[in-house]
Amino acid sequence: MRSLSIFGATGSIGESTFDLVMRKGGPEAFRTVALTGGRNVARLAEMARALKAELAVTAHEECLPALREALAGSGTEVAGGTQAIAEAADRPADWTMSAIVGAAGLVPGMRALKHGRTLALANKESLVTAGQLLMRTAEENGATILPVDSEHSAVFQALAGEDTTCVERVIITASGGPFRDWTLEQIRGCTVAQAMAHPNWSMGQRISIDSASMFNKALELIETREFFGFEPERIEAVVHPQSIVHALVGFCDGGIMAHLGPADMRHAIGFALNWPGRGEVPVARLDLAQIANLTFQKPDEERFPALRLAREVMAARGLSGAAFNAAKEIALDHFIAGNIGFLDMAAVVEEALSAVSADPLFGKVPSTLEEVLAMDHLARKAAEEAASFRQQKR
């Protein structure tokens, strides 16, 4: 029986993964080694019971008593805290979904790779912060990383069986978010609720706001660089409001391979779960005649400066991605809290990158996880200072 673990089980990606696993037979088809979640211990316990999980872990130690009570008599072991989540990744599983949001997903993802199995990676921050280290760890341990972002899953599928030296360009698409038709002045005064109103995808608060600011697409550009190894000049993003084409790959013979699919994360998750084969996934089938038109346009970097910052990070490499992601997370925290404006987020990130760029770690290829975490700490501190300064000026 195939074994699996789901890290970030109670988030949107985790819920979709759980849905697909249950549809494929649940505990009759899979041995669930570990499930992890956050504060929603009732849902985590419900999932653990349904899958007969061996271990359920909440990231918050104060939630452990509630989780223990919810799983009493189930036979499922319980634990709490970030260290417990990392230790859960030490339990070997054939297939692990890494869906913890943010840099917190890096440590368990790295530890899971050391078992030489398959890691379905929805946590884009892992590649952004420590891409070279992550890919090297996978190679050294004979592990496989499958991208679960819809764009990178699309590129992965388009490249299947292809000679990558013949790839001229990789194009990932962006919906443009809720502000694609707003003026710069309108965007400047937007609220958290408005930033969360994504036109095509159903996502959590943080990723919805990242999408609105195009920081999500900026992370994905860096992720493309780190996962596939293409030079920055071969990677670009275009705005595609319909969210039907997820990525395109252009080849040296002039041909372009495009991957089309519904705006449903279960497609990419299902591909990773069924890989190396394919299996039925309960998503809507495209009716191209009904869709009728697919449009594309260049993104406006004045309104979405995160894309420009991403190109600078792709060129610098080293630990610049760790600094970028850390600063972005702090800037997002401050926007959600109402301390800074929407457009201030990019300014905070740029100021933080400038502040830490002189540090010897900034351009260094990471050799240890500790170096990644050290740069993460430096950038968070710099971003806090930049955000606090802007808050005082409001």
From Swiss-Prot:
Give this protein's Gene Ontology molecular function annotations. Answer: 1-deoxy-D-xylulose-5-phosphate reductoisomerase activity; manganese ion binding; NADPH binding
Q: What is this protein called?
A: 1-deoxy-D-xylulose 5-phosphate reductoisomerase
Checking NCBIfam families in the record gives:
Dxr
Question: Which residues form each disulfide bond in the chain?
Answer: none
Question: What EC number is given for this enzyme?
Answer: 1.1.1.267
| GO BP terms in the entry | isopentenyl diphosphate biosynthetic process, methylerythritol 4-phosphate pathway involved in terpenoid biosynthetic process
Q: Catalysed reaction per UniProt?
A: 2-C-methyl-D-erythritol 4-phosphate + NADP(+) = 1-deoxy-D-xylulose 5-phosphate + NADPH + H(+)
Q: Detail which positions bind Mn(2+).
A: 149, 151, 220
- Pathway note: Isoprenoid biosynthesis; isopentenyl diphosphate biosynthesis via DXP pathway; isopentenyl diphosphate from 1-deoxy-D-xylulose 5-phosphate: step 1/6
Matching entries from InterPro entries are given as: DXP_reductoisomerase (IPR003821), DXP_reductoisomerase_C (IPR013644), DXP_reductoisomerase_N (IPR013512), DXPR_C (IPR026877), DXPR_C_sf (IPR036169), NAD(P)-bd_dom_sf (IPR036291)
The organism named in the record is Cereibacter sphaeroides (strain ATCC 17025 / ATH 2.4.3)
Signal peptide (from-to): none
Q: Which Pfam families match?
A: DXP_redisom_C (PF08436), DXP_reductoisom (PF02670), DXPR_C (PF13288)
Q: Which domain of life is it from?
A: Bacteria
Binding positions (1-deoxy-D-xylulose 5-phosphate): 124, 150-151, 175, 198, 211, 216-217, 220
Its biological purpose is as follows:
Catalyzes the NADPH-dependent rearrangement and reduction of 1-deoxy-D-xylulose-5-phosphate (DXP) to 2-C-methyl-D-erythritol 4-phosphate (MEP).
- PANTHER family according to UniProt: 1-DEOXY-D-XYLULOSE 5-PHOSPHATE REDUCTOISOMERASE (PTHR30525), 1-DEOXY-D-XYLULOSE 5-PHOSPHATE REDUCTOISOMERASE, CHLOROPLASTIC (PTHR30525:SF0)
Q: Which residues does NADPH bind? A: 10-13, 38-40, 123, 125, 204
CC cofactor: Mg(2+); Mn(2+)
